[in-house]
Structure formats: C-alpha cells, structure tokens
C-alpha cells in the first residue's frame, strides 16, 4: 500500500512539473508573438498591418530586395487589391491576394520612376515624401493610408544600419560601366596608349582580357593608362576622407558621372576607386573594391579566371603615375589586415546592379 502511494505521489509530481513547464513555455511563446506583432503598425482596422520605414536611402534602394512587407487578413475570405507607391518618386506596385482569417504577408517594392527621380534628390540631399498604401475589394476602397518617409540622395551611402548589418556590398551599385562618362574615359585612355606607346610597352589596345590572350602585364598597362588618363587628361585630384564603420553611419559618395562632369574634378578614395572599377568592368575585366579601416583602393583580376589580382592606390592621383599606383596598391594590400573585398562580378550575379 505504501509503495502504491509513493508511485502515485511521483506521478503527481511529474504531472505538476510538466504542466508548469507547459504553462511557462506557452507564456514565453505568447510573449514572443506579442513582441513580433508589436513591431508592426496596425492601420485600417484589423485588415492590414505594416511597419513602414521612416528613411529610404535611394542609392541602396534600387538594389534592395523590398521596401516594406504588408500583413493582411479578412474575417471573410475575399480578394484584396493591395497597392503601394511613393508619389512622384516610384511607380505603383500592386498585387491581388486572397485574404482569409489568418494573417498572410507579401513584400512590396515599387520601381523608381527613372534616373531623373534619383537625380532630383542630389541637390537638396533629402526630401520628405509619403508612402501611400491602398487596399480595395472588388467594389470599394477598404483602406487608404499614408506614412511620412524621408528620401535620401542616391549619393548617400548607408554603410550599416542601426543593427550593425553591413551594407558595403551595395557599393557595387556605384560602379557604373555603362555611363557615357565611362565610355569617354576608356576612349581617351585608348588615345593615350596610341600617343605614348613607350609608357605601356606590353599594352597595344584597351581590349580587356582579349579573349584570354592578354598577359598580366597587358592588363596592368590598361589599368595604368586609365589612371594616367584620369590624372593628366581629366585633371582628377584625390581628396582624403575616411570611411566610417560605426553603426548607422552614412557617407556622401558621388557617382562617376557626378565627378567626371565637374570642371575641376576631385574624388576621395572610394569615389576614384569606383571610377576606375567602372572602366575596368566596361572593358570586360573583373574589378574589386578593397576596403580597410578608413580607406578603399582598387583590385583587378589579371585574367578571366581571377587566378591573380593586382592592386592600385588611387591616392597616387596627386602626382604619381599609374605604374607607381600599382606598386603602392600592392604594398597597401600586403599591409592590410582582414580587408573587406567587394567582388563586383559576384555582386552582379547576386543582383547588385549599377545605379545608372
């Protein structure tokens, strides 16, 4: 009899512990659910919830996967037409969805109207706009609301957000091989080759990897010619500036066209590197942007297999030749510790395209 009571007591204790654990786990999961739900801003009753951004860095946005995620539901099953736009900056992104009593979600990314919409922000630096959301049923508007959003110029690089997420891969968007100014740069470099063949003995033309026939010295000569053309034909000067690495840091970075159309062009390290990388990519070669604390410089694969990479230091635009910039770039890379390497070809394959 005593043994029976003992095992009953043990069983009861196990049940109590299990029930307590179940309740605690349930409370934790419910708290997590409430935390997740509270990150969204409810609007239009219980139909829609969203968490609209308050800032939009347009230079990054053109390559971002989405702008905002809309959560939707309906007490009765029905088709909803959801549309999102930033008037005078984007087109409308819309979708027809089937709403049920459970929340579902969809990401939206309205397409920018065009380069003129991006360029309009360059002068003022930023502008306050409205993010417009509308939800319709088959016969009426169910929800129409807006949220203020600050649009920042395409020249503003947001290196990392408040959570510390690294945005440096988006710098590949500043590499613009199809820009008319880059076509002009390559053409003027070709003229420099013709006018000064002794300065580039291994290079006969600006032909990239020349279907695998270009030697490493041929490739080096082409990059040297580009750098010399920037310095001696365009009068481009190097301006010192530090790349910030603190959370939520921003920096003004001009596109190649912004700089090369100036009467007295000047560019900091990341800007001059992006100009050269643009020309290198236009030639069908593979550029890299190397980022170390406070600085950036150029890397170029010496063949189509990227079996070897050489480096160029654009701070040498203040008086040194392209060949010396190559020497100094090699030295810079050897002395760097844990550099951030942005492989432009890789980023293209993963959806980071030129801003223009």
How would you label these PLM feature ranges?
Residues 173-264, 306:
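Secondary-structure boundary elements
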Residues 139-177:
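Short beta-strand elements
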Residues 266-345:
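Hydrophobic/aromatic-rich core segments of domains that either
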Residues 71-77:
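Short solvent-exposed strand-capping/beta-turn motif centered on an Asx-Ser/Thr pair
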Residues 8-23:
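Hydrophobic membrane-insertion alpha-helices, especially the h-region
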Residues 69-71, 82-87, 91-92, 139, ...:
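Alpha-helical and coiled-coil interaction segments, frequently adjacent to or embedded
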Residues 81-128, 136-142:
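Intrinsically disordered, low-complexity Pro/Gly/Ser/Thr-rich segments with frequent PxxP/GP/PP motifs
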Residues 28-71:
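Beta-sheet-dominated interaction scaffolds and their linkers
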């Amino acid at each position: 009899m005593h043994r029976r009571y003992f095992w009953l007591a043990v069983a009861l204790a196990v049940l109590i512990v299990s029930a307590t654990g179940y309740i605690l786990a349930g409370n934790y999961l419910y708290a997590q659910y409430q935390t997740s739900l509270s990150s969204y801003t409810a609007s239009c009753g219980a139909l829609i919830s969203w968490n609209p951004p308050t800032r939009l860095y347009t230079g990054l946005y053109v390559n971002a996967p989405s702008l905002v995620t809309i959560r939707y539901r309906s007490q009765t099953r029905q088709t909803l037409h959801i549309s999102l736009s930033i008037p005078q900056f984007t087109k409308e992104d819309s979708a027809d969805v089937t709403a049920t009593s459970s929340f579902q979600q969809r990401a939206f990314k309205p397409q920018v109207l065009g380069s003129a919409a991006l360029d309009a922000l360059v002068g003022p630096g930023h502008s306050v706009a409205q993010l417009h959301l509308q939800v319709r049923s088959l016969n009426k508007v169910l929800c129409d609301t807006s949220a203020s959003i600050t649009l920042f110029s395409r020249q503003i690089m947001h290196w990392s957000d408040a959570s510390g997420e690294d945005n440096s891969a988006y710098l590949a968007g500043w590499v613009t091989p199809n820009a008319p100014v880059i076509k002009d740069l390559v053409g003027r470099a070709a003229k420099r080759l013709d006018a000064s063949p002794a300065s580039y003995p291994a290079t006969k033309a600006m032909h990239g990897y020349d279907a695998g026939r270009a030697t490493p010295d041929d490739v080096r000569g082409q990059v040297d010619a580009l750098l010399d053309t920037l310095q001696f034909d365009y009068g481009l000067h190097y301006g010192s500036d530090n790349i910030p690495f603190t959370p939520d840091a921003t920096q003004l970075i001009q596109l190649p066209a912004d700089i090369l159309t100036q009467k007295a062009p000047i560019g900091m390290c990341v800007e001059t590197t992006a100009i050269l990388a643009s020309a290198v990519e236009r030639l069908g070669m593979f550029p890299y942007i190397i980022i170390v604390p406070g600085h950036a410089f150029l890397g170029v694969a010496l063949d189509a297999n990227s079996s070897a990479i050489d480096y160029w230091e654009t701070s040498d635009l203040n008086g040194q030749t392209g060949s010396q910039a190559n020497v100094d770039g090699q030295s810079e890379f050897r002395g760097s510790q844990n550099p951030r390497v942005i492989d432009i070809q890789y980023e293209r394959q993963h959806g980071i395209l030129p801003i223009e």
